[in-house]
Swiss-Prot record:
Pfam families recorded: Chloroa_b-bind
Name of the protein in question: Photosystem II 22 kDa protein 2, chloroplastic
Chain's gene name: PSBS2
Superkingdom classification of source: Eukaryota
Membrane protein topology class: Multi-pass membrane protein
Organism of origin: Oryza sativa subsp. indica
Organism lineage string: Eukaryota, Viridiplantae, Streptophyta, Embryophyta, Tracheophyta
Xref: InterPro entries: Chloroa_b-bind
């Protein structure tokens, strides 16, 4: 019996050395949690999405002209507004000069008239073509109109602000209430008027008023009232600044 016990003890020792003690499920779960925490701590960062350039989107928004910028020579609406103001002054001065002297624009400049259009001076033809293209926006009318902000202080006229406020007009700013968009439209009309009056005078030898059978060569006080009103309208529209502004692709306030 003692011999059997002594033989069993080495067997137990051998079996104890041969097999490693198994860890409990709680210990295995803790090891897994530690492993997960380490992985989360060294997780690679996700790449940030590239920033979208919003300026390219704005370019398509501000091009609201007839031909856009791609079909022109880079004119902005502010440039076209300046050309329109010059055209309004020129058209008003030419009508006033013809009404007083009885001569058209070209006759006042001693240029040959009453000839076919292809025999006209090349520089004159270039000027007519430039004026026509500018009137329809083919030179490039990049930009869009943004009106001034309107609020309660603009809608209600405060009492006791002066003579203009008593008449229902704004104390500051232009008298007509024109915006730059309206002024641009009137400038285009003046450009068209100059171009077609020049074409008619080249062919017929008559000025713009003579083509309409309006009496010319008279003193200023005898000019037709409607004609005088048109002359004054173009003159004041050219020198009267309009409200609002033009915004271009570069987000510059014009």
């Amino acid at each position: 019996m003692a011999l059997q016990q002594s033989m069993a003890m080495p067997m137990m020792v051998v079996s104890g050395l041969g097999t490693a003690p198994r860890s409990s499920p709680m210990v295995q779960l803790q090891r897994m949690k530690k492993h997960l925490v380490v992985v989360a701590a060294f997780k690679s960062r996700t790449k940030a999405s590239p920033k979208v350039d919003k300026s390219n989107k704005n370019k398509s928004i501000v091009e609201d002209g007839i031909f856009g910028t791609s079909g022109g020579i880079g004119f902005t609406k502010e440039n076209e507004l300046f050309v329109g103001r010059v055209a309004m002054l020129g058209f008003a001065a030419s009508l006033l000069g013809e009404a007083v002297t009885g001569k058209g624009i070209l006759a006042q400049l001693n240029l040959e008239t009453g000839i076919p259009i292809y025999e006209a001076e090349p520089l004159l033809l270039f000027f007519i073509l430039f004026t026509l293209l500018g009137a329809i926006g083919a030179l490039g009318d990049r930009g869009r109109f943004v009106d001034d902000a309107t609020g309660l202080e603009r809608a209600v006229i405060p009492p006791g602000k002066g003579f203009r406020a008593a008449l229902g007009l704004s104390e500051g700013g232009p008298l007509f209430g024109f915006t730059k968009a309206n002024e641009l439209f009137v400038g285009r009309l003046a450009q068209l008027g100059i171009a077609f009056s020049l074409i008619g005078e080249i062919i017929t030898g008559k000025g713009a008023l003579a083509q309409l059978n309006i009496e010319t060569g008279v003193p200023i006080n005898e000019i037709e009232p409607l004609l005088l009103f048109n002359i004054l309208f173009f003159f004041f529209a050219a020198i009267n600044p309009g409200t609002g502004k033009f915004v271009t692709d570069d987000n510059d306030d014009q």
